[in-house]
Amino acid sequence: MCAVTVVPDPTCCGTLSFKVPKDAKKGKHLGTFDIRQAIMDYGGLHSQEWCAKGIVNPTFTVRMHAPRNAFAGLSIACTFDDYKRIDLPALGNECPPSEMFELPTKVFMLKDADVHEWQFNYGELTGHGLCNWANVATQPTLYFFVASTNQVTMAADWQCIVTMHVDMGPVIDRFELNPTMTWPIQLGDTFAIDRYYEAKEIKLDGSTSMLSISYNFGGPVKHSKKHAISYSRAVMSRNLGWSGTISGSVKSVSSLFCTASFVIFPWECEAPPTLRQVLWGPHQIMHGDGQFEIAIKTRLHSAATTEEGFGRLGILPLSGPIAPDAHVGSYEFIVHINTWRPDSQVHPPMFSSSELYNWFTLTNLKPDANTGVVNFDIPGYIHDFASKDATVTLASNPLSWLVAATGWHYGEVDLCISWSRSKQAQAQEGSVSITTNYRDWGAYWQGQARIYDLRRTEAEIPIFLGSYAGATPSGALGKQNYVRISIVNAKDIVALRVCLRPKSIKFWGRSATLF
């Protein structure tokens, strides 16, 4: 009796097919996979189980079926976006790798396998369970795109198939899972940077120029089309500097026709080192693909988190590249920095953890022409505040970056409000009313209500950040609590500043904001 070789795969929960151009160019958007919709459309056991449980914490396995080809010199990436942070039209309907790499991503090299896999736990990336109904805050989506231009043009466009597989896991009894980060930020023995860098190239001209990746791992960064702040950059920007060891991997994305070897090393200066300087220090010689672990080496044993020029991961060509006469492409490779392991060096925070963090400043207030009063409503979530009744200047700091780089937040803060006036105190008239509210203003669902003389110039009031779902995104989710600031005789206000004093805040989800 013959063994059964063709069996159904009970883990499959959805499929996607897309065409790859024969001359695929870096940044080409190939396909979009809506995870929730795909499971519902595919139907079957998983859809029924999901409906029965309501909310789950599944483990997904993405399988990209692309025939192994060592000659194409092509890589395809898959980026996961749970919070609708990728706006393809705003990116020119392309997927520029540097911007996409700010979000959780896996890069597949065609030379490596016939079936390329990426397994991830949904809750670990997002911080919450997967609900079986659509909502305004989340839309788990995979974007497939060309990560590096293929070096050899194929005979024709070709089809690629993606299958999604799932283990729904046990039923869970809450939406929010363990927070991804809490404030004040505390790092453990290791921190997952999990960041790919756009393909580097060693040209076929005998050049031995040094390549590098800057150690400024924190704060917003400018890419080809957008600025970006990712989760790892937000977390690392908490401190002025960092030191320790980074580990990662290097993968060749070149055609098999082209090979080379190079050395990876820590370097501080702008000028490239001699080979002797490299070999005297910590280094790792790479022959194609491989893992690396490199300790930072700078004059002061530390690198500035948000500044260029205080350290870099150097890459120096050694041997090659070697390629046939007809080959025109460079030797290309992609660096992935996976983990940072801090050492015992002490680094101060950018700002004190108990200090105030400026949220926004209002100038050019526009009071009502008849009453002279202007109102500002500040909701119970941190976001890019806007108002038609004033000029708004948003502040930028590690707290605002962490909000932008995650999906949900929850906690308690003090709103610290201060203002400057145009008149001397003895001549100043007017007042500032500050109230905590819920629902529409006319319903008068109020908590605290205080009136301050305009001459006082400052006030504080606590507010909870959250929603009916517990945590809140950076946007309205149903009716939310809010603070209303009402200013009588507002024409005398030169500027009004709103700061946050964090008491305890939790954050969920590894993401990024492109702006």
Curated annotation (Swiss-Prot):
Location of the protein in the cell: Virion
Main subcellular location: virion
Domain of life: Viruses
One GO cellular component, as annotated: viral capsid
Matches recorded under SUPFAM superfamilies: Positive stranded ssRNA viruses
Keyword terms of this UniProt record: Capsid protein, Virion
Molecular function in Gene Ontology: structural molecule activity
Propeptide: 1-2
Gene3D superfamilies given in the database record: 2.60.120.20
Summary of subunit composition and partner proteins: The virus coat is formed of 60 copies of the coat protein.
Name of the featured protein: Capsid protein
Native source organism of the sequence: Tobacco ringspot virus (TobRV)
